[in-house]
Amino acid sequence: METLASRLDACQETLLELYEKDSNKLEDQIKHWAQVRLENVMLFKARECGMTRVGCTTVPALTVSKAKACQAIEVQLALQTLMQSAYSTEAWTLRDTCLEMWEAPPKRCWKKKGQSVLVKFDGSCDRDMIYTGWGHIYVQDINDDTWHKVPGQVDELGLFYVHDGVRVNYVDFGIEALTYGVTGTWEVQVGGRVIYHTSASVSSTQAATSDDDTLSPLRSAAAAVTATATATTAVPPTLQDSAQAPSSPPPKRQRVIVGQQWQQPDSTRKVREGQVECQNDRSIRNPDSTDPRRGHSDLDAVPVIHLQGEANCLKCFRYRVQKHKDVLFVKASSTWHWACGNGDKTAFVTLWYKSQEQRAEFLTRVHLPKGVKALPGYMSAFV
């Protein structure tokens, strides 16, 4: 016990020295999280041995120490990969690398230069919410673990960033309006200035034209979007603290797509369930090729979609859309495979919907990753 107490004291002394040093070097932040990990590992072991106190330190429950140790391991590994990137020489403080910053939206990304974004739902001060937009967002590529620095952006649809030409929303004002608003309208303010104000419903929102003074705290994001996106949509402002170029009003309405931004379809064009356009090998199959709107004999059947594709890709996609649960779908399954048959290792994730209308809305709004197929169908309802 004395050996454990002395090691714990040494670990805590190292942590105090790091706090007093208040370094802005990334290697010191990695060392800090390594010590946090070691501290919780020792407390976990002490609790396993039946100890409730080690010196002056109260030993927490096993689950508490285990959870904190796992969090420390996750952050430490993320910082170690960041150390191998081109951004390791930037200033990284304890505040920049804390757990709260790691888990703040967008989750599992590093963020800098936060700025408050005020959104008034229904135009009422009683229904306003404050969100944090980030000037710089450090995103890790899921394929090769490399880090990329992208600017945080804001428009009338929400807070987002663009990575590899794909728009990733981490705050969707339309979905937030379902929670905090009634009429489906809202107003976005950055730095005390109104940059967008909606006067119609969520589905027909148009950005208000802003002058140079209104957009003065923001900067054009033309360098952050692809040539295709800039050719069809307005360039949203970023949240970086630098000079900006005025943006032009969007020529057409826009709609938020999970993981990407698509142009709103023409109002004269009807999209029927099971007939959503697919691009880049993303296809949607009909459960019944003769009539996609067929009835179902089982009164307890509920509409579902089986997403088919590579297991890791499906897991990442499910993680991205789970924040929109109850709005775009009811629940999602874990990744599953067929146990026997033709030996195909294709994975599936099943999404459950409360109605055919909700499923149709999902197919219309959600952008599927490349290689993922959506297979609509029905399942018997069960708890």
Swiss-Prot record:
InterPro entries: E2/EBNA1_C_sf (IPR035975), Nucleotide-bd_a/b_plait_sf (IPR012677), Papillomavirus_E2_C (IPR000427), PPV_E2_N (IPR001866), Reg_prot_E2 (IPR033668), Regulatory_protein_E2_N (IPR036050), Regulatory_protein_E2_N_1 (IPR042503), Regulatory_protein_E2_N_2 (IPR042504)
GO biological process terms held by the UniProt record: DNA replication; DNA-templated transcription; regulation of DNA replication; viral DNA genome replication
Single GO cellular component term: host cell nucleus
Region listing for Transactivation domain, in residue ranges: 1-202
Region annotation Disordered: where it falls in the sequence: 233-297
Keywords assigned by UniProt, alphabetized: Activator, DNA replication, DNA-binding, Early protein, Host nucleus, Phosphoprotein, Repressor, Transcription, Transcription regulation
Family matches, as Pfam families: PPV_E2_C, PPV_E2_N
Subunit comment: Binds DNA as homodimer. Interacts with protein E1; this interaction greatly increases E1 DNA-binding activity. Interacts with protein L1; this interaction enhances E2-dependent replication and transcription activation. Interacts with protein L2; this interaction inhibits E2 transcriptional activity but not DNA replication function E2. Interacts with protein E7; this interaction inhibits E7 oncogenic activity. Interacts with host TAF1; this interaction modulates E2-dependent transcriptional regulation. Interacts with host BRD4; this interaction mediates E2 transcriptional activation function.
UniProt name for this protein: Regulatory protein E2
Originating species: Human papillomavirus 57
Lineage: Viruses, Monodnaviria, Shotokuvirae, Cossaviricota, Papovaviricetes
